[in-house]
C-alpha cells in the first residue's frame, strides 16, 4: 500500500507546486497590466470626481447624433502628461500596488480563520466555479443522501475572501485616489505613503482610511452574487460546458458591472469627500451627508455614469453651477 501511495502523494505535491507557480505568475501579470494601464485609471478617477479641464467640442455620438463631446480617455491622459510629465502619470500607483499585494496575501488566510479550514476541493478558494464543468457541479450537488445543498461552501468562502481583500486594500485605495485627486487643486498633502497616512490619521482618524468603502462593498457584493448565480444556473440547468460558462460569466460580469457602475463613482467621490483637498470640498464638490446622499445627487444631476465610457463622451447636461471643475462650454451650433 505504501508503494502505491508514494507516487500518488508525489504527483499531488507536484500539482500543488505548479498551481502555486501559476497563481504567482497570474498575480504578477495582473500587477504588470495594472502598472501599464495606470495613466488611464488616473484619468478615469479624475473624470469620476467631475474634473473636466478640457472644454467639450461639437461632435457626434456613436449613433451619429450631434452633441457636445468631451475628450476621450487617451486625450485626458495626454493632458495629465502635458502638465506633470511622464512620471506624473503614475501618481498613486505605489499605494495601489501595495494594497493589492497585501490583499492578495492576507485575504485568503483571513477567510480561513473566519470560515474555517477547507474540507473538500470545492471549498478551496483557488477552485474557480466559473471554469467548473457540469460534472464538477453535479459532484458537488450530490450528497450521500441525494440531498441538494442550499449554499455552496466554496462560493461562501470566495465571498468572504473578497470582502477581506477589499477591507485590507481599501486604506491604500483611499490614499491612491487622494494622491491622484491632488492634480485638481495642485496640492502636495499626499506626496508620500507615510505622509499620507499621517495626514489622514491626524485630520480624520481611523474612519478616514475607510471613506467610501460601503458603496464599494455593495457594488462588489452585487456583482459577485449576480454573476456567479447566472453562471451557476446556466451550467446546472442548461448543461453548458466549460467554454460556454466562461463566455456567459464574462458577459454577465460586464453587464452587471455596468448596471452597478454608479456605486463605483460614489465610492471614488466619498474617498475624497471630507479631506482637506480642494477636490473634496465646495465649490469643486458638493457637501454630502453620506454616500446615499452622494448617489442621489449624482443621479439627479445625471453625473452618476461619469467615466463609464472611454470614447464618445457626450456631455449629459449643462452643469447646474460653474464651480471651476469644468472648462467653459462653447455653444453648439
Which sequence ranges carry the predicted segments?
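Flexible extramembrane linkers and terminal tails adjacent to transmembrane helices
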Residues: 1-28, 55, 62, 108-207, ...
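N-terminal signal-anchor/initial transmembrane insertion module
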Residues: 1-99
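Conserved long hydrophobic alpha-helices within structured protein cores
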Residues: 37, 41-43, 103-115
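Alpha-helical membrane and juxtamembrane elements of multi-pass inner-membrane transport
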Residues: 71, 87, 191, 207-208
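Interfacial aromatic "cap" segments that immediately flank transmembrane helices
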Residues: 89, 205-214
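Residue-level recognition of transmembrane alpha-helices
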Residues: 92-93, 159, 213
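Selective transmembrane-helix segments that form parts of the transport pathway or gating/packing helices
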Residues: 93, 97-101, 105, 216-221
